[in-house]
Structures are given as C-alpha cells and as structure tokens.
Amino acid sequence: QYELVIPQKRLSKTSDDRRWRAEVYRRLDLHGELWYAELEDKRTKNVVRHELTEKYTSVSLVDFYKKAAWEGDRFVLRDRLDRETFSLPYP
C-alpha cells in the first residue's frame, strides 16, 4: 500500500514559553490527502494528535495551510490570504 507522510517544516512552531511544540504533517495515500497536527508537551513528552481535515480529499490543501503561529495560548494556521483556517488551544 502506498503511503507518504510529509512533515510541513514551515508550519511547525514552538510556543513562546518553549513548553509546547506543534508539528504539522501532510499524508498522501491511495485515498487522497489528509492533514494532521501533533502537539507535544516538551516537559512530559506527551504527544496529542489532532486531525486538520475530517476526511480524505483529492484537492491539494497546501495553500489552505500556508502560515502558522502561536497567538497567546492558541496554535493558529492561516491560508495564503491570512484567514484563520484552524486553531488549537493548549491541551
């Protein structure tokens, strides 16, 4: 079975207090494209996975998830027009 997981380095960020690290991944397989984020607590090394897309899509979402930043206590993803497309609060 074909499967490719591509880490999106430009979207991976560490929080201002350096406690949290958010990593974003793009997964391609026979069903299409799926995006997810892993939020790691650097103190406990606990990792929580959050799906960015509810189901597989055949359309590329590269421009839909273009920028990332920590805004206060939220990890926020924005599209190329700077609209918020996903946000994730501290767990």
Spans of model-derived segments:
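Structural core positions within WD40/WD-like beta-propeller blades
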Residues: 20-23, 76
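Structural signature of eukaryotic scaffold interfaces centered on beta-propeller domains
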Residues: 4-18, 64-71
